[in-house]
Amino acid sequence: MAAWGRRRLGPGGGGSRERVSLSATDCYIVHEIYSGENAQDQFEYELEQALEAQYKYIVIEPTRIGDETARWITVGNCLHKTAVLAGTACLFTPLALPLDYSHYISLPAGVLSLACCTLYGISWQFDPCCKYQVEYDAYKLSRLPLHTLTSSTPVVLVRKDDLHRKRLHNTIALAALVYCVKKVYELYAV
């Protein structure tokens, strides 16, 4: 594997990549072991316990629950990005377009940003799954004990701090709300 080879560093660097062992508190594996008719419920319970225990890495072997979790995280990411991009469009459109026409783009973009931020806040903000992202980096995946798995396509979640991300989309959505209220007041009150 290429991930096991030497890493090229800039001038003066000569380090090599080594396989880093993870402690038991870093990684949790939801194994795909069907031991009864309620196996799916057991997988979901194990995943929920792992999320609440805040493991750095969670490996999900069962395909169905892994795919559902990855989709849930993807939808949350989409809402976050839409809130940020629509809010940014709302705030910067008046700078790029004539003032007479900018509200045709900035007001709907502001409403979209606020709607996505609100939906994220209601549905995702307090879900322990929102603290995780799906890991695709081959080098980081090579550090995990994936050789012990029975599934060939596990979903790997990595815990990431989302405080700055939440602050960003909340701040932009709030600024978009303030702009929209100001613009609606100017359009209809004056």
UniProtKB/Swiss-Prot annotation:
Protein localization: Mitochondrion inner membrane
What highest taxon heads this organism's lineage? Eukaryota
| Keyword Secreted (UniProt) | no
> Span of the secretion signal?
none
The membrane topology noted for this protein in its Swiss-Prot or TrEMBL record is: Multi-pass membrane protein
Q: Which residues cross the membrane?
A: 84-100, 107-124
Q: List the disulfide bonds.
A: none
What Gene Ontology terms describe where this protein resides (cellular component)?
mitochondrial inner membrane; mitochondrion
Keyword list (alphabetical) reads: Membrane, Mitochondrion, Mitochondrion inner membrane, Transmembrane, Transmembrane helix
Q: Supply the Pfam families for this chain.
A: Mito_morph_reg
KW Membrane (keyword) present: yes
GO terms (BP aspect): mitochondrion organization
Q: What does this protein do?
A: Plays a role in mitochondrial morphogenesis.
- Protein family membership: Belongs to the TMEM11 family.
The subunit field of the Swiss-Prot or TrEMBL record says: Associates with the mitochondrial contact site and cristae organizing system (MICOS) complex, composed of at least MICOS10/MIC10, CHCHD3/MIC19, CHCHD6/MIC25, APOOL/MIC27, IMMT/MIC60, APOO/MIC23/MIC26 and QIL1/MIC13. This complex was also known under the names MINOS or MitOS complex. The MICOS complex associates with mitochondrial outer membrane proteins SAMM50, MTX1, MTX2 and DNAJC11, mitochondrial inner membrane protein TMEM11 and with HSPA9. Interacts with IMMT/MIC60.
Could you tell me what this protein is called? Transmembrane protein 11, mitochondrial
- Specify the taxonomic lineage: Eukaryota, Metazoa, Chordata, Craniata, Vertebrata
